[in-house]
């Protein structure tokens, strides 16, 4: 009987996701016991500024990965969209379970859809990716940054001067909220999701063959291949958190992956969007990035990063 220490952030969503994975793993192998160790990450500690200003990818995983490398914990469950495109040496994503709904949702006062929101409506989001795409569709909107867990954000919509907020459908679903709280599901055609949105990443040490063997039984091949394409695109674009970047892949029954990538300026005035097809997920991701870079997306990323550095200097 082996006792597995599972690292998790303290947030309700993180704990819910971790407990869901543990339940699945216990069903697959009753010989393992699991114990959760709570870990506070940098992203949890800093709540008064936008995520893009706090630092690059890895805000919600770095401390957890350090605990894994030191042997303090054995594994962790992350939201895939929080994962950096390159993992520390010695760690690996051992498994990606079946993806939840990858879409973003709009929740508004008076149940008004995005197109029906009044001129200059205030929309809450903490994501540059969401705000850039919203402003592309509705340049009149006022984007107001909003942080905190799902319950906190829903409360702020009620009590503060937001007309609407944007959240991930997967988070709402995992927290037990029913679809009737949602005003509108935003189609990927209008609001492309974050890379890996709706998917979980189960991470462990690459040397832990016992856990890797167990994880393989929870892995979903469709999710793994499509998310791999998205992450290859993100890695090749070197976007980080400071630039609005999105990627979403689908796969047909013949194994052909269709990846749509997007890079935008924060004001939504410049948007590069491309769709690439192929059977090799890594190659599809790289090709999408190469096509977009050639058209100017890489230059836009470099410009946005430079402007941010100049602003902070």
Curated annotation (Swiss-Prot):
Pfam family, one: Porphobil_deam
Catalysed conversion reaction: 4 porphobilinogen + H2O = hydroxymethylbilane + 4 NH4(+)
Named cofactor requirement(s): dipyrromethane
Cofactor comment: Binds 1 dipyrromethane group covalently.
A biological process term (GO) from this entry: protoporphyrinogen IX biosynthetic process
One Gene Ontology molecular-function label: hydroxymethylbilane synthase activity
Annotated keywords: Porphyrin biosynthesis, Transferase
EC numbers on record: 2.5.1.61
GO cellular component: cytoplasm
S-(dipyrrolylmethanemethyl)cysteine: residues carrying this PTM: 241
InterPro entries: HemC (IPR000860), Porphobilin_deaminase_cofac_BS (IPR022419), Porphobilin_deaminase_N (IPR022417), Porphobilinogen_deaminase_C (IPR022418), Porphobilinogen_deaminase_C_sf (IPR036803)
Keyword Nucleus: no
Pathway: Porphyrin-containing compound metabolism; protoporphyrin-IX biosynthesis; coproporphyrinogen-III from 5-aminolevulinate: step 2/4
Subunit structure: Monomer.
Function of the molecule: Tetrapolymerization of the monopyrrole PBG into the hydroxymethylbilane pre-uroporphyrinogen in several discrete steps.
Family, per entry: Belongs to the HMBS family.
Additional note from the record: The porphobilinogen subunits are added to the dipyrromethane group.
Stated name of the protein: Porphobilinogen deaminase
Protein species of origin: Bacillus licheniformis (strain ATCC 14580 / DSM 13 / JCM 2505 / CCUG 7422 / NBRC 12200 / NCIMB 9375 / NCTC 10341 / NRRL NRS-1264 / Gibson 46)
Lineage: Bacteria, Bacillati, Bacillota, Bacilli, Bacillales
Gene: hemC
